[in-house]
Amino acid sequence: MATQHIENKLKLLPDLPGCYMMKDINSRIIYVGKAKNLKNRVRSYFKSSHEGKTAKLVSEIRNFETIITSTDKEAFLLEITLIQKHKPYYNIKLKRGTGYPYIKITHEKDPQLKIVSQVKKDGGYYFGPYPNVYAATETLQLLQKVYPLRRCNGYQKRPCLYYHMGQCLGACFKEVPQSEYEKQIKKIKSFLNGNVSKIKKELEQKMETASENLEFERAAEIRDQIHYVEMTVEKQKIISNDNTPRDLFAFYMNKGWLSLQIFSIRQARLMKREKRLFPCIDTPEAELESFILQFYNQKNRILPKEILVPSGMDKETLSEILGIPVKTPQRGQKRDLLEMAQKNARLVLEEKFRLLELDERKTTGAMNEITDALGLPNGHRIEAFDHSHLQGEDLVSAMVCFIDGKPEKTEYRKYKLKNVDHADEAASTREVIYRRYSRLLKEKANLPDLILMDGASIQINAAVDVLHNQLGIDIPVAGMVKNDRHKTADLMTENDEKIGLDPKSEGFYLLQRIQDEVHRFAITFHRQVRSKNSLASRLERIQGVGPKTRIKLLRNYGSLKNISAASVEDLESLGISKKVAQTIKLSLKN
């Protein structure tokens, strides 16, 4: 039986081709599959009865992810890549090879064309895998006729049968110049990379001639050959037409949230898909620019040869900083890939919003699950707090209110911190808790049944201290703790005890919703404050400071305080002229 979380996600599946990844309780991928229609295929696991291995697989599924593609053939090719990468337990048959054919040009003195089932690091050229084994075989035979290499076993003092048929260059009885092989290999590689128009045209002419001569069986054979060529070497979005290592970034923004998709194309294949989802502080383009720089600043992150990004990005500056081309494709296969990534970004964000809507309708008992877990009497009102700042500047706090498991937005509050001038979680908590509840006491308003802090013991202890020792009131306080992946994980009590909720329970969904909402609200408010006095906007107003200079200052100093503290000589060492450096110092004093 599917959990409520899975039931909700099943309602949101698209009627599109793609791949799905089934995950267990530890978020490990245990099965990868492909589908012409993701909605129908994934639902079938949970809406039908199963036996044996499939029944065991379904019993272990706790979550799933999808990647949409443009065609079911792309889904097939992506499935193979994902299986080879993740090696899911229930895809055991594909672990030692895909089971699907590749066409290989061997790395030998006298090279051959072969059909193989695995890719090896042996210097050969591999093309595929191909969904249709028969079509791949027929295409191989066509290539052997049109662009022959060696088809015999090698030198045997006399010409082989294939040489007489024009399907072997003659390694069987003579020394074949390497230049001749290289010429043929170049043509074969071009053909298998999708440049088939010349051969198709020749085949079509032969088919017409055969029809005119009433050789209908021959015409049908040629027609089938054309079909096999199209099936085998048809251009795919998941497989690019060159081996350039490239990363592709796409985004979708809505309701203050930004969804990112990162596609890593290696060896002409989509080798990795990463996704990020977070509240957007700046414009989506600026957020993505910042994200890309941080992305490649991580340890062990290797730069590709090329980066593809949406329009509106500062490609020139990104390219200068990273030292590689950053482009926005306008047409063709790369543009299609970018659109596919953007479509995936949109679906991920829409799924989040629609899941929240579905969860909101199922709040019965969710509040009680949280209070029961904390050993508290059942209540109705939760108030949650979070702080936000950037490099210790523009410090703000925000509070959201949930009544009976639903957000009560008229009760939301924003706070500009007055007594804290640097990043200090305890001090920020003390100030906002005192301001909020001293006011409620003064107004004789209703107090909440539970206070949740976005954090752990530091925030909890500071809040309890203010409530007990300064205000003399007893309101339970708990922390919302995140895991290493920055996702909601546990509750923390006033005694520093971590309490886990069932990740698929309504109580956990409510906790996750509250944490996401207070974080979003705090960041949105911080963005408003920061935009009025942000580092970027202050620098933009300084005469002589353009985009490149701004990037240099941001990368080297990070805050107005640090730039103000720098000497004119320090600024000059970044390649900034003395006049502009003096202007910067003067402007930031005001």
From Swiss-Prot:
Cellular-component GO terms for this entry: cytoplasm; excinuclease repair complex
Major localisation: cytoplasm
Segments forming a coiled coil: none
GO biological process: nucleotide-excision repair; SOS response
A GO molecular-function descriptor: DNA binding
Source superkingdom: Bacteria
GIY-YIG domain ranges (all copies): 15-92
Keywords: Cytoplasm, DNA damage, DNA excision, DNA repair, Excision nuclease, SOS response
Localization per record: Cytoplasm
Xref: PANTHER family: UVRABC SYSTEM PROTEIN C (PTHR30562:SF1), UVRC/OXIDOREDUCTASE (PTHR30562)
Cited NCBIfam families: uvrC (TIGR00194)
Assembly description: Interacts with UvrB in an incision complex.
Function: The UvrABC repair system catalyzes the recognition and processing of DNA lesions. UvrC both incises the 5' and 3' sides of the lesion. The N-terminal half is responsible for the 3' incision and the C-terminal half is responsible for the 5' incision.
Name of the protein described by the UniProt record: UvrABC system protein C
Originating species: Ligilactobacillus salivarius (strain UCC118) (Lactobacillus salivarius)
Encoding gene per record: uvrC
